[in-house]
């Protein structure tokens, strides 16, 4: 990939000039100028996903300049480099090939001259066989009973993705009960173990190195809990499987290495749900639905790689996001799914985006001081969020672009619940875009029989300025296929922005310093001695903890 500071490009300079005139134009004025703006500013994927970006403060000129910026930042070359197995993760000297995990076309993908697809397919076949044995009841626990509960022990990408997807696809769930343990806080594993039976529980230990502190601490606690009942250590093999590459450590734990499912260093943690890390997903919904999830992502991969930039959904979303943060001054983006099953979707992409693009050093090793990189990502399902934080989105002093996501068809057609949900989905983006003027507020009061003298003091508080940018993503129905496509769409959006921010999106050195310091502090907590080796604040906190424990 070429290392290009975006602010040095002609397109960036043109965008700065364009913004000076465009910033005075409101979204409402844009709709007045372009009567069928929806048609020109929306894109469809597979006739199952509609992305409407018309309620953004962009024009055809804006989009043209943003596309020129993508061209000057050599985006198409970067896309080809990623898909072809080039080692674009330079700081770790790794390829970035989560797309190969869902390569349903099975076309060769080379890393260091070797096609990775035979190994990918072998692990998928192994996962399929394992899922069949567990789901069918053929796999027995140490007392001869079938498995009823699966506990996935992992953290970060080994937890967030599988948990998000299993929740999103609960309508496809089989009889197995899925549980997820991530936090090293003993409460998490303790509360989970209260819900399961050692005779019928299967633990999946998800750690590439089998050394991750949080995961292995929880895994050993689960093992101790299991052996308190099972007694015989040979029984561990019937109740534990590993998602790892460290066969020696896996065997030492007591897991049969035949039940170790590997993945590769070209799979980043936050992009790993497509790999063996997704075994919990496959166990929850069945392997055929897991394959449909992969297929949806693969179709989005093909769209991203082949669609012209004008029709390219992930690229368009990325460019508009860059415009909102770097020219309109937004610092956050909210992801607001109007689907309760998607209640972990925003949290998943909080990691996906912020761990990928939360960088202040560019690919040249230079400090970035004249443009913004990754935004803060957050969100909650609608309509809950409307009664929590939408107030600030509508009337606060901070610009918060939002992605609204909703399915046209619900899995639970209870009375008129879905119509009420979707009426809010449609209403919110309309309200955010167009607001309510002082004159409209006054007219409402007059219609209600109030005189303007009576209400003049309250009128300003009921005015909505509007002009708040949103994307509306309407999905025909949340299925394994469409969910796979949605996830891949956001993954590629993140990638595009990383390319254009001139940063490395696939490392995460920011998580290391805290871990190093925690490893230094841990032995200091083993006794009651007063600590003086840190700054006064850290010393004071540690010493107070020692007094209170």
UniProtKB/Swiss-Prot annotation:
Signal peptide positions (record): none
Any single Pfam family the record assigns to this protein: PGI
Function: Catalyzes the reversible isomerization of glucose-6-phosphate to fructose-6-phosphate.
Gene Ontology cellular component annotations, sorted alphabetically: cytosol
Species classification: Bacteria, Pseudomonadati, Pseudomonadota, Gammaproteobacteria, Pasteurellales
Organism listed in the record: Pasteurella multocida (strain Pm70)
Protein name: Glucose-6-phosphate isomerase
SUPFAM superfamilies: SIS domain (SSF53697)
GO biological process, one term: glycolytic process
